[in-house]
From Swiss-Prot:
Known role: This protein may be a central component in the iron-acquisition system.
Gene Ontology terms for molecular function: metal ion binding
Induction behaviour: By iron deprivation.
Domain of life of the organism encoding this protein: Bacteria
Gene Ontology biological-process entries: iron ion transport; transmembrane transport
Major location (coarse): periplasm
UniProt name for this protein: Major ferric iron-binding protein
């Protein structure tokens, strides 16, 4: 009896000595479905609960700056590198362990200068086209060539998309400011703007326009839902280092976090094999961890022949926004 009591007391002491894991709050600028899938997988693996506060990345970055040290957020998960760059420049992000950053480090994958955010998954800028009107041979070799009279009222674009803004940055870096502004003015004059990538995709599917500049995963989700054999559209990857660039989603831990250990575990989980599998099982994003393969049968990133561009900075984002204004798109 005394032995049983002794063991019970020992177990109680060990339990008391083990600190409870804190729940974490994630300010989420990623698509909610994908973020929720990863959060649920993380909770199952660790027991740490995750509260998602979802909104646009820029909006959340502004909120974090305003909240400062009082922010309840532990992690910022953004689809836009410029939003992360804004917080990094304000010294609001906590450096991440090299082991986390190295999980997704590879050729062409942007790396934070201060090592305070990590690239997690990729999306490719693509041209979705109507197969009833066009074949691959009818498509342009460069995304810049869609902003021409040949494509008047035939090409769609989404000027409010964060990925579109980063594509402008890529064009400036690779081709120069004049080329970027010419491209924007051409799209403004000859193209048709849409409020969302999904709306632009549907416009091509419905035959309203011949093609549109979108992100790859919108089409993959649509094709999976409808059945590839039942849709009229396909994707064209521009390739050969054209500014149809790979864009990354990223995650970061905030310096103001009261639960840094748990927050860093979450970001490490996102970059690791289990988190990457959970994310890419529900969205057609490119896993950046080399040990994970997408369930959407995506081409390997290397075959996309994406251009090598550095991570977008705050000043580059602001410059791209000014070009949008000059072109009359804002």
């Amino acid at each position: 009896m005394k032995t049983s009591i002794r063991y019970a007391l020992l177990a109680a002491a060990l339990t008391a000595a083990t600190p409870a894991l804190a729940d974490i709050t994630v300010y989420n600028g990623q698509h909610k479905e994908a973020a929720q899938a990863v959060a649920d997988a993380f909770t199952r693996a660790t027991g740490i609960k995750v509260k998602l506060n979802s909104a646009k990345g820029d909006q959340l970055a502004g909120q974090i700056k305003e909240e400062g040290s009082r922010s309840p957020a532990d992690v910022f998960y953004s689809e836009q590198i410029p939003a992360l760059a804004t917080l990094s420049a304000a010294n609001l992000l906590e450096p991440l362990p090299a082991s986390t950053i190295n999980e997704t480090r590879g050729k062409g994958v942007p790396v934070a200068a201060k090592k305070d955010w990590v690239a997690l998954s990729g999306r490719s800028r693509v041209v979705v086209y109507d197969t009833r009107k066009l074949s691959e041979k009818d498509l342009e070799k460069s995304v810049l060539n869609y902003a021409t009279p040949k494509w008047k009222n035939r090409i769609g674009y989404v000027p409010t998309s964060g990925a579109f803004l980063e594509q402008i940055v890529a064009i400036v870096k690779l081709k120069g400011e004049a080329a970027a502004l010419k491209w924007l003015k051409g799209l403004k004059e000859y193209g048709k703007p849409y409020a969302k990538n999904s709306v632009a995709l549907q416009a091509v599917e419905n035959g309203e326009i011949d093609a549109a500049l979108i992100n790859n995963y919108y089409w993959h989700a649509f094709a999976r839902e409808k059945g590839v054999q039942n849709v009229h559209t396909r994707l064209n990857f521009v390739r050969h280092r054209d500014p149809g660039a790979l864009v990354t989603y990223s995650g970061a831990v905030l310096k103001s976090s009261q639960n840094k250990d748990e927050a860093k575990k979450f970001v490490a989980f996102l970059a690791g094999k289990e988190g990457q599998r959970a994310l890419t099982a529900v969205r057609a994003e490119y896993p950046l961890n080399p040990h994970v393969v997408s369930t959407f049968n995506l081409e390997p990133i290397a075959k996309l022949e994406a251009p090598q561009v550095s991570a977008t900075t705050v000043s580059e984002k602001e410059h791209a926004t000014r070009l949008l204004e000059q072109a009359g798109m804002k």
